[in-house]
Each structure stands twice: as C-alpha cells, then as structure tokens.
Amino acid sequence: MPTKLYWAEGPWRGRLAMASRPRGDDWLEDEMASWRREGIDTVFSLLTSEEAKDLGLEDEAKHVKARGMQFVSFPIPDRDVPDSDAKVAMALERLDADLSAGRNVVIHCRQGVGRSGLISAALLVMKGFTPEAAIKSLSASRGASVPETAGQRRWLDHYAAILGGTKLAPSHTVR
C-alpha cells in the first residue's frame, strides 16, 4: 500500500500534502509513481542523508526526477528544528512559490508529523495564519497533533515573531 498523503488546506492554487517517508529500496519506484498519480509535482524531503540511507531512500531524488517531479532536500535532524532562519526562509519561499504557481507539493520526514508538520505550519504562518490556527488546521488534516515536540512548537512561535517584526539576534536559534 502506498504511503498516505495527508492533504492540508491552504491559500494557494496548488495543494499541500504531508506524508511519512516513502517506502524505500525496491518499493521506491512504485511509491514515486503513486505520488505522481496523486498529482504531486514537488517532493520536499526533510530527512538527513543518514536517515535516507538507513531507510533505503538514497535514490529518492533520481526516482522523483524520473517521474517528472522536482526534488528538494532540506535536512532537519529527527525531532529537531531548522538550524538557520535564513535557510528556512529560502526553503519556505521556494515552497510558497511552487504552491502559488499551482504546483502540488508533498513535504515528508520519517513519520510525517514532527518536521513535516513544523514546515507545513511555518508555511501557513508565512501566509498569515497564527501558529495556533496553523497547528489546529494541520493536526486536523493529519489526524495527529503536529508538530511533534515542544521545541518544534517554540521554533514556530520564534518564526512567527520574526515575521511579525520582533527583533531577534540573527544567530538566535530556538531548540
């Protein structure tokens, strides 16, 4: 059975999905074919290279591209948060541009709850949602509470404060 996509509501022409990692190794080609049939245009992976290797997903980018989709890797360690506000801003702008252009995007991590929920919530906050509203909407879509950790929730509040113009030191990292 293919990895389930959890579709989220958002203000874009394209659609946003969260998912756990696709099945790897011999199943990877079938997984990417399934995601393409579901209408996915961009696969946004939050797995680290070590996780991808352990899960049989070293060739994920190759299989994604072979199906005519775009692949973006933005590694965040499991149960953690982005390590750079500038890098996450660029990643979120890329996701927002794809979604605004009508492209369908899936964001995945290992279980599709913590990191996927965090980045999806940050996208909604970027579009004007409060952190609470983003979490409520995405948790309902996912059928599980997102994001996974208190540190991820603190980071989402930190990101919302940055967008709201709150002055923070550029090197400030919330964990």
Walk through the language-model features, giving the residues of each:
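Cys-dependent protein tyrosine phosphatase-like superfamily
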Residues: 1-106, 119-175
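Ser/Thr-glycine-rich phosphate-binding loops at phosphate-binding pockets of nucleotides
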Residues: 116
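Short cysteine clusters
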Residues: 109
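Conserved G/P- and acidic residue-centered "switch" motifs that form tight phosphate/ATP-binding loops
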Residues: 112
